[in-house]
Amino acid sequence: MLLAVMKTDFFKTTKILDGGMGQELLARGLISKGTLWSASALINEENHGLIVDTHRSFIDAGADVIVTNNFSARKVRLEQNKVENTFEYINKKAGELAVKARDISKKNVLIAGGLPPQNGTYVPDDRDKSIIEKNFKEQSELINPYIDFFYLDVFSSSREVEIALDIIC
């Protein structure tokens, strides 16, 4: 899918990405559980409309690209909060809700599949490479059916970037 997007003229002009979904959800009243942050909205079905509305607000504000709301839907974060059983459901749901927002908007926006660091945020992941590969593979496969390309979000080391690219390319 990335190759197909790159063959178009899409990246030949400036494009606007959406804003910080997690912060916007909190500003709109989301109550985060533990360190789940925006994943709380995916776990609780009552918040799915809030996610769609927030995506739509970014689209209406002029975003050419929206990013799936799965930054905190990584295994390590879910395990820390004792909700690892939601991993598959919430990653798929992040893709589904982004597609729903785009479809409702009837605008030609692309959906970027957010791939966050697979351990902590803003710290290099020094765990065994096979663990990181497994986590990237599982998360990328769950969101892949819903997206136009992957977006590597807040990586803290070139090692993580290389591992992610090896998995998705």
Language-model features: where?
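Domain-level signal for soluble alpha/beta catalytic cores
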Residues: 2-169
